[in-house]
């Protein structure tokens, strides 16, 4: 920017009165198997008991103390039925001191009669299985007479062979059948003696038991209930009124398995306070299963080796010495260790297997446990896998409880407090802010320590401030002296609110608009600055400003006066003056004249002077 300046006249060779003009240019400013159990209508068949390989079926009577299992019901002509060939292996070596079991029915039956009864029972059960497999499991069978007698072949026709039942390999279960009778006190219950037999080597692993059947004449007939065996956790009997207990090889009271139309109560897996909740299925209908109203009957289970029924290794092996009056709780069934392992005297194992009145087989792991206080401590021993003892299970639970106490579950652990460095544990004890976890007591203002949970706060460099403390840290506007809460506009080393940064002349906001500052530090827009400080034309008296769209100011300086380009004219003729020879400025007595007008004025003045002389 240039201020107007006047130049003195020069003494040149030009004609008198010619005034040269000077033109100046000024720059402007400038974002994650249903198990179906089908019950058939009541149908009475021959009673069957659990397989008890405690006697030798080929043992001939005659020795002292050689007693046989309970005989079947008497037949009209038992001598006409010869034994079935090839159904049993050669008898093991005899051991008179192996063990003794008392006989419940000391009737004098021959071996042929018992074999005939066994053959008849096998045929009867085979026909039942064939019927059930051929018919639809969801189609009800027509009811039959409830007083049907024991199915047996005609006594006049000898039985020469048996139909072999096809038994599946998975899951291997034993055939178990229980009868119902009146429960009697333990001292009056007479165990059934069995003839001592030879000793076999204990089997280290459980194997499927053969379908050996027997019948007793002193027990009433009962219905047959068939279930499809599905893998599921152990089912153990709970204590109930009327059940009979006897001494067992374990350290706690052995509970016989109850027999009823419904599933027995589930066992405990880890202690007396938990029980397995079985999967939901079709509950047994009334009228099915056992119809005896004489109360539950608990059949004694004689000690046997681990190869029958999946007993643990701690039980007495087959052929070892046991007490005659030993009653044993029936254990849950476990699958065999090898796929096709058969015991001598068994039927071959293949295809799907079905069993009679069997508890579900044990699964490798039990479902989640739920608290249950139905069993007292000594009356409800826990059902645990064979590899765990009760002491080991208790120690395992104790260690787990201590670990859970020292290491809370992941659901209650939220992380480490960013303020104090301690763990944030428990619902309602912590909060999350600025992508960090804090204790409720630790999440406070960094200045005044007021708690900020549920309150608005301001985060500055990972530090929390309450609103008053945050406002106090803000810069103040240079115009209104108030804290700047939003966007800050900085100019000339000062902070402004965007709406406070305005021109002092027109009071228009200069946010995003070019501006300039005068010598006093006052802010002006470009237009108002030129209006206030630009030189003014000596003709029109208006400020000389840049043309629209231009950044430079063009002015003419002559006789120390400033002119707009369009205002620089001859005062007499009004002709536009320029730097040309004939268009130059020839001032006369302070007037801006062209050469012609200047000459005319000079002649007039000369003539007047001559007249005066």
UniProtKB/Swiss-Prot annotation:
Question: One Pfam family, short name please?
Answer: LIM
Q: Which PANTHER family match?
A: LIPOMA-PREFERRED PARTNER (PTHR24207:SF0), ZYX102 PROTEIN (PTHR24207)
**Bias (Polar residues):** 26-40, 210-231
Q: What is this protein called in UniProt?
A: Lipoma-preferred partner homolog
Q: Which residues form the LIM zinc-binding domain?
A: 415-474, 475-535, 536-604
* Other remarks on this protein: Fusion protein carrying the DNA-binding domains of HMGA2/HMGIC and the LIM domain of LPP causes malignant transformation of NIH3T3 cells.
What family is this? Belongs to the zyxin/ajuba family.
**Where in this protein does the record say Phosphotyrosine is found?**
245, 302
Q: Which residues carry this modification: Omega-N-methylarginine?
A: 250
UniProt GO BP: cell adhesion
Composition bias of kind Pro residues appears in: 68-94, 184-194
| SMART domains reported in the protein's UniProt record | LIM
Signal peptide positions (record): none
């Amino acid at each position: 920017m240039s201020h107007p300046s006047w130049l003195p006249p020069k003494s040149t060779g030009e004609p008198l009165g010619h005034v040269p003009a000077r033109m100046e240019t000024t720059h402007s400013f400038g974002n994650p198997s249903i198990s179906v159990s089908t019950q058939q209508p009541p149908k009475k068949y021959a009673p069957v008991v659990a397989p008890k390989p405690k006697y030798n079926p080929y043992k001939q009577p005659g020795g002292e103390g050689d007693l046989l299992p309970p005989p079947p019901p008497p037949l009209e002509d038992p001598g006409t039925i010869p034994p079935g060939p090839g159904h049993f292996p050669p008898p093991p070596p005899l051991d008179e001191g192996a063990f003794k079991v008392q006989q419940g029915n000391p009737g004098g039956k021959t071996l042929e009669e018992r074999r005939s009864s066994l053959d008849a029972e096998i045929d009867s059960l085979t026909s039942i299985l064939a019927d059930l497999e051929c018919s639809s499991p969801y189609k009800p069978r027509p009811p039959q007479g409830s007083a049907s007698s024991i199915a047996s072949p005609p006594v006049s026709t000898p039985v020469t062979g048996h139909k072999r039942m096809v038994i599946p390999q998975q899951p291997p279960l034993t055939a178990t059948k229980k009868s119902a009778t009146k429960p009697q006190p333990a001292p009056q219950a007479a165990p059934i003696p069995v003839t001592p037999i030879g000793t076999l080597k204990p089997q280290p692993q459980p194997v499927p038991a053969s379908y050996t059947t027997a019948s007793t004449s002193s027990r009433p007939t009962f219905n047959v209930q068939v279930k499809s065996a599905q893998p599921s956790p152990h089912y153990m009997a709970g204590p109930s009124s009327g059940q009979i207990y006897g001494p067992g090889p374990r350290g706690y009271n052995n509970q016989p398995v109850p027999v009823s139309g419904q599933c027995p109560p589930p066992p405990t897996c880890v202690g007396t306070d938990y029980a397995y909740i079985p999967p939901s299925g079709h509950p047994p209908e009334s009228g099915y299963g056992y119809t005896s109203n004489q109360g539950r009957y608990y059949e004694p289970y004689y000690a046997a080796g681990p190869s029958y029924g999946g007993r643990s290794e701690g039980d007495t092996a087959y052929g070892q010495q046991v007490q005659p009056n030993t009653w044993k709780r029936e254990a849950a069934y476990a699958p065999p260790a090898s796929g096709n392992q058969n015991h001598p005297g068994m039927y071959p194992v293949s295809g799907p297997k079905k069993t009679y009145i069997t508890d579900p087989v044990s699964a490798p792991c039990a479902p989640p446990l739920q608290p249950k206080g139905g069993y007292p401590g000594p009356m409800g021993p826990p059902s645990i896998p064979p590899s765990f003892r009760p002491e080991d299970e208790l120690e395992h639970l104790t260690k787990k409880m201590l670990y859970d106490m020292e290491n809370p579950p992941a659901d209650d652990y939220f992380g480490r407090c960013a303020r104090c460095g301690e763990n944030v544990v428990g619902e309602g004890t912590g909060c999350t802010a600025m992508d960090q976890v804090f204790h409720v007591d630790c999440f406070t203002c960094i200045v005044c320590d007021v708690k900020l949970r549920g309150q608005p706060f301001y985060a500055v460099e990972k530090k929390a401030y309450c609103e008053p403390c945050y406002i106090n840290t803000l810069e103040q506007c240079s115009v209104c002296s108030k804290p700047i809460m939003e966007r800050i506009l900085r100019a000339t080393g000062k902070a402004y609110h965007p709406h406070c940064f305005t021109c002092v002349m027109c009071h228009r906001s200069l946010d995003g608009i070019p501006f300039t500052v005068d010598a006093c530090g006052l802010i002006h827009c470009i237009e108002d600055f030129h209006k206030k400080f630009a030189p003014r034309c000596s003709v029109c008296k208006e400020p000389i400003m840049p043309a629209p769209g231009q950044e430079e100011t063009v002015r003419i300086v002559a006789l120390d006066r400033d002119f707009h380009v369009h205002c620089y004219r001859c005062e007499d003729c009004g002709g536009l003056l320029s730097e040309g020879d004939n268009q130059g400025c020839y001032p006369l007595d302070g007037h801006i004249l062209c050469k012609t007008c200047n000459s005319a004025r000079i002649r007039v003045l000369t003539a007047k002077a001559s007249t005066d002389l």
